[in-house]
Amino acid sequence: MRIKLEKELAKVHFKAKFLWDNGATEEQMKPTLALIRKSQWRWDMVHSSHGAAFHAPIESERLLSDGLIYALEAEKNLDVLKEKLHIAAEFVMPDISTKAKAQKEIGLDIPKEEAAKKEFLKTIVPKWIEQAKKEGRLVTQK
């Protein structure tokens, strides 16, 4: 159920962007965004409560099922709005089958992010370590 919901959530997020890019207004999108949010919350609740699938499997499945229903309802709303706006272009789900493809699709510049992390580790972390040493708060240093 979790995988079904994750695929549907990804689709409705991209489909919502497609409609934004084709002229949908905030007022038109408001009910659909509420459904997407409800769906996302349910996925997040189950996914972030690490032991839920073991300790409360029926409740976890119920939450994921509810999330899927909200996501499918959101997709239906998006399809109706697309027709209402007379958008001729077809929505094409991007290929996000790998982490690299997904990162590229959302515009994440990995080399830039890696460079920023390297700079952070080189400049900021040593200052934190030095300050912790001065204040006697450094328990261990690797």
Language-model-detected regions and their locations in the chain:
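Primarily the internal scaffold of c-type cytochrome electron-transfer domains
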Residues: M1-E114, K118-F120, I124-K127, A132
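Extended, compositionally biased alpha-helical segments that mediate assembly or anchoring
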Residues: K134-K142
